Amino acid sequence: MKNTQGKINELLNESGCEHNQHKHGEKKNKSCSQQAQPGAAQGGCAFDGAMISLVPIVDAAHLVHGPIACAGNSWGSRGSLSSGPQLYKMGFTTDMSENDVIFGGEKKLYKAILEIHKRYNPSAVFVYATCVTALIGDDIDAVCKTAAEKIGTPVIPVIAPGFIGSKNLGNRFGGESLLDYVVGTAEPEYTTPYDINLIGEYNIAGEMWGVLPLLEKLGIRVLSKITGDARFEEIRYAHRAKLNVMICSRALLNMARKMEENYGIPYIEESFYGIDDMNRCLRNIAAKLGDPDLQARTEKLIAEETAALDLALAPYRARLKGKRVVLYTGGVKSWSIISAAKDLGIEVVATSTRKSTEEDKAKIKRLLGADGIMLEKGNAKELLQLVKDTQADMLIAGGRNQYTALKARIPFLDINQERHHPYAGYVGMIEMARELYEALYSPIWEQIRKPAPWDEDMGILAHEYTSNHDHILASIEELI
């Protein structure tokens, strides 16, 4: 896949996105067609975006062609879990040096691919371009093609060097690599009328494992997972699914749209967070598959699960009802978590709109109401001031804001991809309620908000001094 300016513009002007110029004309978000601006990669560059989209393919090797820091500084940042192979957790890099920059790194890359195949025998090798290797002009496509012919294993180039744009653009390039080199290259053993693909679900903290059993109960088969806990082979025959389900992510929208164009697979966009969204997701999948019996089974399952969930959540709702939180995260989580919080009786008084589409912002306005605050961006000082002004009880944000909250003695819950607890599906709601309860009612808050013992002693002494000057000297002598 040659990464030309035309290709970049094509992905930036995604026709399935409401920001596209054909849909909005003059109102189009200008960032869709602009060159990457300085700072656009803050919080994740295009290389990082492509990598975190594809690394969850657990039986493949992922080789970063560039300086060692490109792999080392970003490896393992997304907590995707595997139910089997662990090869995806091993970081491979060509460790480009100054000599390689001068003389080229193509031979080094070729040898690295052969060595990985010899020692680990992966199902496939994904090779990621970085800024350095793109700037010196290494022909990664040609090297991958030659190596694949030599070892008889697919070698997929992922040309998304960091300087071309943001993490979201890199996600789309990852999807393009799958479309160009993987999807449609194999056939499944059999198909059913109930085969679906999950796109944009990365199995963070094992979240997908709380949803798959529900689909199995309904007789729905997940043919391919793109890409959480995925095997390379299943992505090869993803083109035989009857429906693509986009989960809480528009970053791989290009993949869903092109699979509809190329293979006639319709797609829907859903969320696994919150009771209402989970119910809606199951209903919409059943409706799209078009089987009345499946729809009846879905309603029965929803009734059973929500009844059991209400019993499990009752003690948490009693303690969480009326609590106020500030939500500071990005993308679809800025509205999907609001829905989950409302199910627990929690009031979200403010949320961020970073990386949110216009559709996301409309959902936020509807969920928050007229009094809700929408933050475009904010630093630590502004966040703490917002918590104070809104009298919020808690900050829900990503790990980078953890110490901001803890230093201010504010309860905190990590909601981003680094977390270790699954919040999706019905079982995820129970886990989220438990985490919120434990964070809010931890005994540590009462302890750390008390004055220090020496401050208490001095306060007592000051009071005694002002009330009875004659006794203060004796008190000081006793303490000394």
Swiss-Prot record:
UniProt GO BP: nitrogen fixation; protein-containing complex assembly
Gene3D superfamilies, per the entry: Nitrogenase MoFe cofactor biosynthesis protein NifE, C-terminal, Nitrogenase molybdenum iron protein domain
Region (Disordered): 12-35
Keywords: Nitrogen fixation
Source superkingdom: Bacteria
Transmembrane segments: none
CDD domains with a match to the protein in the record: Nitrogenase_NifE_I
One Gene Ontology term of the molecular function aspect: nitrogenase activity
Pathway the protein contributes to: Cofactor biosynthesis; Fe-Mo cofactor biosynthesis
Protein family according to the UniProt entry: Belongs to the NifD/NifK/NifE/NifN family.
Alphabetized NCBIfam families for the sequence: nifE
Function noted in UniProt: This protein may play a role in the biosynthesis of the prosthetic group of nitrogenase (FeMo cofactor).
Identification of the protein by name: Nitrogenase iron-molybdenum cofactor biosynthesis protein NifE
The species this protein was found in: Nostoc sp. (strain PCC 7120 / SAG 25.82 / UTEX 2576)
Taxonomic lineage: Bacteria, Bacillati, Cyanobacteriota, Cyanophyceae, Nostocales
Gene designation per UniProt: nifE
